[in-house]
Curated annotation (Swiss-Prot):
Species annotation: Arthrobacter sp. (strain FB24)
HAMAP family: IlvD
Pathway stated in the Swiss-Prot or TrEMBL entry: Amino-acid biosynthesis; L-isoleucine biosynthesis; L-isoleucine from 2-oxobutanoate: step 3/4; Amino-acid biosynthesis; L-valine biosynthesis; L-valine from pyruvate: step 3/4
Protein name: Dihydroxy-acid dehydratase
Lineage: Bacteria, Bacillati, Actinomycetota, Actinomycetes, Micrococcales
GO biological process: isoleucine biosynthetic process; L-valine biosynthetic process
Record key words, sorted: 2Fe-2S, Amino-acid biosynthesis, Branched-chain amino acid biosynthesis, Iron, Iron-sulfur, Lyase, Magnesium, Metal-binding
Co-factor binding comment: Binds 1 [2Fe-2S] cluster per subunit. This cluster acts as a Lewis acid cofactor.
Subunit relationships: Homodimer.
Length: 573
């Protein structure tokens, strides 16, 4: 028996499976004394202790609502019969850290978040958790922590930002999101947009609190939280400023106490079938390629075997239905207007494309939740009908071939044609490609190869939104293929292949590409090949040494020593 002795009755789970060691008996007197100082009374020591963890900060709009939502979650915990204990963790804003050295720290923050939540929960022997997050890496970081700890846990998303509205100097008006600013930078640099219009877009893109508005990484991961069963049904889509989120916060607090009473933990919910549901929903929405990386990492924490092959296997059966930015016309608030994530889940379930028997944080199955909500049908515009999809298969494809023996990830929704063959233009890290584009040295038909940006070689597997936005802004979005051992933003558009594995620093084929080589990708065949004679390629390996480490101390140096391949989720350990 562990040191945290449980006292459950024969048929009833203990609602304090861990905290008794700090609340019960004479040896807990020092801990009880500290608890009294933070407001606990005699009656509270019999209640389960619930951690309310959030990545709240004032650096970015993504997280601004989280302190308010944490208060709501605490109210719900009290109402449910528990005692809430609020604590915080970090968050990195990709929108601010994009395109410079700061982006090295983005994916690293996912691990720091998971580790920090685990550290507090384990050190203080807290019984369960409500985990709140708003930015791209904080969502998977929280879900990784939940899976690793395997306690009663509910995840709650901060919510999406409302779209901005801009009137340009030619009199045209349109909705805009953060991604429009990155593309406007490229257009302005190429002389295709005035500085005045760039300024107008800058001032319009973020009208208030919330995460980036399209089906980018944060909204994709919020949909995944709901599809996995780790978030309350219907909680992913309402915008951050909508006070329905406060009610979801209160209900999340009540729900975690109910999970303790039922004896349900995170791994009871995050099963292989649940991950298959999450992949299916991601494919149907046309979600971010970052979902591949994050789902692999979350599954590993849940001790569920998930591989890149699962994404193609499921994607083959799931049509792409969401006409959502970055490739489509609509944003997350539009999804909310037509009923939210339950709409697409109900359609997939009715078509036999989801597992309805998966348990969720309500204590009920996915099918039971959807029957209770009874969401409307797909609207046919924002979310297309199953028999009239945007693409017949999912929006993300895993490629293999001589260019990526361990795999690469492509948002196939961005390709108008299945086949692209072009000439390599090779750059060591992102800045070289940006400089070449600014100087007019990237042309139609080029394959821009950016290497030494992988999990270990970067380190941190930076997102390439600055260069992809600039390529699109320069009018080359459909004519230039970009491939990298780094990542792409959920807002990236164009012809982009990322997560190329093995990465350059590990001696993957990407390390040996030279200017002028021909590279061919065939989306339908899922092939991705370097068209160089094998003997020539082997000769290039003679005497090869990777670029020296860019960081030799601090968190990035530690990360580079611990991180694994993107093909397995870029997990540490």
């Amino acid at each position: 028996m562990s040191e945290d002795t449980q006292t459950a009755t024969e048929n009833k789970p203990d609602i304090k499976p861990r905290s008794r060691v700090v609340t019960d008996g004479i040896h807990a007197a020092p801990a009880r004394g500290m608890f009294r100082a933070v407001g606990m009374g005699d009656d509270d020591f019999a209640k389960p202790q619930i951690g309310v963890a959030s990545s709240w900060n004032e650096i970015t709009p993504c997280n601004l609502s989280l302190n308010r939502l944490a208060q709501g979650a605490k109210e719900g915990v009290h109402a449910g019969g528990g005692f809430p204990m609020q604590f915080g963790t970090i968050s990195v804003s990709d929108g601010i850290s994009m395109g410079h050295e700061g982006m090295h720290f983005s994916l690293v923050s996912r691990e720091v978040i998971a580790d920090s939540v685990e550290t507090v929960m384990q050190a203080e022997r807290i019984d369960g958790s409500v985990l709140l997050a708003g930015c791209d890496k904080s969502l998977p970081g929280m879900l990784m922590a939940a899976a690793r700890l395997d306690l009663a846990s509910v995840f709650l998303y901060a919510g999406s930002i409302m779209p901005g509205w801009v009137k340009l100097e030619d009199g045209s008006e349109k909705e805009v999101t953060l991604i429009d600013a990155f593309e406007a930078v490229g257009a302005c640099a190429a002389g295709k947009m005035s500085r005045g219009d760039l300024d107008r877009i800058e001032r319009a893109i973020c009208p208030g609190e919330g995460a980036c508005g399209g089906m980018y990484t944060a909204n994709t991961m919020a949909c995944i939280g709901e599809a996995l069963g780790m978030s309350l049904p219907g909680s992913a889509a309402p915008p951050s400023a909508d006070r329905r989120r406060d009610e979801f916060a209160r209900k999340s607090g009540e729900a975690v106490v109910n999970l303790l009473r039922l004896g349900i933990t995170a791994r009871d919910i995050m099963t292989k079938k649940a991950f298959e549901n999450a992949i299916a929903v991601t494919m149907a929405f046309g979600g971010s390629t970052n979902a591949v990386l994050h789902l692999l990492a979350i599954a590993r924490e849940a001790e569920v075997e998930l591989t890149l092959d699962d994404f193609n296997r499921i994607g083959d059966k799931i049509p792409h239905l969401g006409d959502l930015k970055p490739f489509g016309r609509y944003v997350m608030t539009d999804v909310d207007k037509i009923g939210g994530v339950p709409v697409i889940m109900k359609a997939l379930l009715d078509a036999g494309l989801l597992h309805g028997d998966c348990l969720t944080v309500t204590g009920k199955t996915l099918a039971e939740n959807l029957a209770s909500i009874n969401p409307p049908d797909l609207d046919g515009k924002i979310l297309r009908a199953l028999d009239n999809p945007i693409h017949k298969t999912g929006g993300i494809t895993i490629l293999h071939g001589s260019m990526a023996p361990e795999g690469a990830v492509v948002k196939s929704a961005g390709f108008d044609a299945d086949v692209f063959e072009g000439t390599a233009r090779v750059f060591e890290r992102e800045q070289g490609a940006l400089d070449a584009l600014d100087n007019g040295k990237i042309n139609k038909g080029d394959v821009v190869v950016i290497r030494y940006e992988g999990p270990k070689g970067g380190p941190g597997m930076r997102e390439m939104l600055a260069i992809t936005g600039a390529i699109k802004g320069a009018g080359l979005g459909k004519d230039v293929l970009l491939l990298t051992d780094g990542r792409f933003s959920g807002g990236t558009t164009g012809l982009c292949i990322g997560h190329v594995a093995p990465e350059a620093v590990d001696g993957g084929p990407i390390a040996f590409v030279k200017d002028g080589d021909r590279i061919r990708v065939d989306i339908a065949a899922r092939s991705f090949d370097l068209l160089v004679d094998e003997a020539e390629l082997e000769s290039r390996k003679v005497g090869w040494e990777p670029l020296p480490a860019k960081f030799t101390k601090g968190v990035l140096a530690k990360y580079a020593k611990l991180v694994h391949s993107a093909s397995t989720g870029a997990y540490c350990g």
